[in-house]
Each structure stands twice: as structure tokens, then as C-alpha cells.
Amino acid sequence: MGLLTGKTAIVTGAARGIGKAIALKFAAEGANVAFTDLVIDENGLNTEKEIAAFGVKAKGYASNAANFEDTEKVVNQIKEEFGSIDILVNNAGITKDGLMMRMSEAQWDAVIAVNLKSAFNFIHACTPIMMRQKSGSIINMASVVGVHGNAGQCNYSASKAGMIGLAKSIAQELGSRGIRANAIAPGFIITDMTNQL
């Protein structure tokens, strides 16, 4: 019996990379796992199979985490299909690096939308469910660059700093209702995304 037996976790951006590793670890601990990614392609289908191999319920959902309406729909669908939402991991993220003086508004907006707005979207959609359950755990995957900054990554750094502040604020708002919120700020991890840097 694992630490998360009977719990349902949502992990955003989990078809590969850090999100996939988190989803697999949760499944190994007995959690049912719903995960999202922009598309559920061969990577997503393979991830779904790998999660299910632990004997838990697993399903990947194609969803644009940066879109408020998409997020509300997918969270409601997950609640209907899984019965509860106990854990939310806001992991969806992208990079579009460049020096400030060369960065376009589109580069800035894309990173803030996927990395930070998506966390707001999912927290906003999951909070009423967790409040009715009187329990829940929200985890924002931030980054060490959200604490220290990094040249050429002002958009990414700002988005990750925002995720840290968001977690702190949500913890204060929802802690008395049995809902925890934390941010994790890892250093550089080799993934498909970082291989493109």
C-alpha cells in the first residue's frame, strides 16, 4: 500500500520530462493520475500506459493549460471521471529565451501564459473541488531562476518567481480549509525542453 493510495492527482504538462517523472512516482505510490499536455500524441499515450502499469487509473487529456475555459472543462471532466481531485501539480512550462533588449512581446506573453497563467487557471478550477473535500495539495513547479534570476531568461524567471508567490498566497488563503500549497524550485534538469536550450 502506497502513500497515495486512493488519491487522485492532476499533473499538468506531463506527457514527458519532469511532469512524467512526477506522474510515475505518484502512480508508484498508489495515486490515480490524470495528466494534461497540449496534445496527447505518442509520448502521451506511452505515458498513460506506463502510469497504468502500476495498477492505477490513468488518463491523458489534451488541453491548453494557458486557456481558462479549456482548463475549467478538463478539470470538470477529470472530477467526473476520477471522482476526486486530491493533488494538483502545476508543471506545464515552456522556455522562449532571449536577452531583454531582443525579446519580443510574443516571447514574453507565451512564457507567462503557459508557465504562470496556467497555474492560476488550474488552481482556480480545482479549488472549489478541494474546498468541498476539505483537503488538497497544490504543488507549483517553479525554478531556482525564479529565486535568483538568469540572464537571457527574464520571462522564464518572472514566470517562476510568480509561481512561488502564487503558492505562498494560496497557502495563506486556503490553509485553514485543509488545502496545502507549496512551490518546488529545482535547478537545471536535463529534459526534452532543456535539451533545446
Language-model features and meaning:
Residues 123, 159, 167:
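Active-site helix of classical SDR
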Residues 143:
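Residue(s) in the substrate-gating loop at a strand-loop-helix junction
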Residues 2-34:
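Canonical Rossmann dinucleotide-binding motif of NAD(H)/NADP(H)-dependent dehydrogenases/reductases
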Residues 41, 62-74, 105:
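The beta1-alpha1 cofactor-binding region of Rossmann-like NAD(H)/NADP(H)-dependent oxidoreductases
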Residues 128, 172-176:
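Alpha-helical segment proximal to the catalytic Tyr-Lys
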Residues 31-46:
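Conserved glycine-rich Rossmann-like NAD(P)H-binding loop of the short-chain dehydrogenase/reductase
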Residues 99-100, 107-112:
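Substrate-binding pocket helix/loop in short-chain dehydrogenase/reductase
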